[in-house]
Amino acid sequence: MLKKLMQSVLPELGKNSRKAPRDVKYPGKRDAVDGNTAVIMVEREASDAAGAYPITPSTQMGEYWAEAAGDGHINISDRPLIFVEPESEHAAAGVTAGMSMTGLRAVNFSSGQGIAFMHESLYAAVGKRLPYVLNMGCRAITKVSLNVHAGHDDYHCIDDTGFIQVMAKNAQEAADLNLIARKTAELSLTPAIVGQDGFLTTHLIESVMIPERELVAEYLGRPDDLIDTPTPAQKMLYGPKRRRVPTLWDVDTPLQSGTVQNQDAYMQATAGQRPYFFDHIEKLAEGCMAEYGELTGREYQRISTYLADDADYLVVGMGSMIVQAEAVADYLRETRKLK
């Protein structure tokens, strides 16, 4: 059955799904890599610093970052990479937050129980408006027994923290969504999570158009760039222009952070998150996706669809299963006339 499925689908795959290629400025550089590698090939150009503790199946991301740092890799900001491996995932979340507070473009990598362990720190990262990216190799959280393979327990256990969340279906999306999530995070001042399925994407080698270093530089810019403040609420805080990654901890201009708020002030600060920050994310994300599509030809939407315009049946999902679901949709249309 599987052989018949592939023989039927492969010649037709993409006939209805892919637009004709067009000339774009940054089509990418073709390579054969897994999802973990695709992430690091982007992050080592974009980011300044990583705080991470290794955990399967995202271990390779931290390892590859550490290798790049050890080799003296210089990113688009002309900085050598910084890597700190503390004693746990909980500490890694604090380290990454601290890096972001000092104005560095920061990143973390984790999975499964590691995400659950750092859970409490993620709320504070949102409340402090720290625009870092957490890369997640999505893994089942231990219940009746240990399982290191794919599951979305960790991805959904942080739904209530306020992080921006995006999920890649393959290694190509893991690379592209890192850049899109990063730009959205830095414009909205809200941290972002980029998920990919453990082993099914993190360790599966496939053909990927790796984003060029020049694309990363043009699309993201440097963390110390002065940009036009993108929202009215941010203008109240920073004025008409601000640093792309704000510096909250600065030894030259020290300030206090994380103070105690009693009921009235805490209520106002918490309620104000939505109108002043969260409500702007949708528009900012759509703008970042549109700009990325113009530069690369690879277009993204907040909710992606496949052959849905005239469909009678819809399969709803996320992650690596989408690749198979798209192939099944092609097969059923071709062989069963089912839409």
Which stretches of residues belong to each language-model region?
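Thiamine diphosphate
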Residues: M1-C157, G162, L179
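Flexible, glycine/charged-enriched surface loops at secondary-structure junctions
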Residues: K15-K19, D23, L189-G195, L295-Y306, ...
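Glycine-/acidic-rich phosphate or pyrophosphate-binding loops and their flanking alpha/beta elements
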Residues: D34-V39, A290-Y313, E326, D330
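Conformationally flexible catalytic loops at phosphate/diphosphate-handling active centers
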Residues: S77-L81, A192-S304
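Short helix/loop capping segments that flank catalytic or ligand/cofactor-binding pockets
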Residues: M118, V144, H203-I205, Q324-E326
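Glycine-rich beta-alpha junction loops
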Residues: R139-A140, D197-H203, G319-M321
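Conserved thiamine diphosphate
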Residues: V148-G198, T202, I210, Y219-T229
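Generic long, charged, amphipathic alpha-helical segments
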Residues: A325-K339
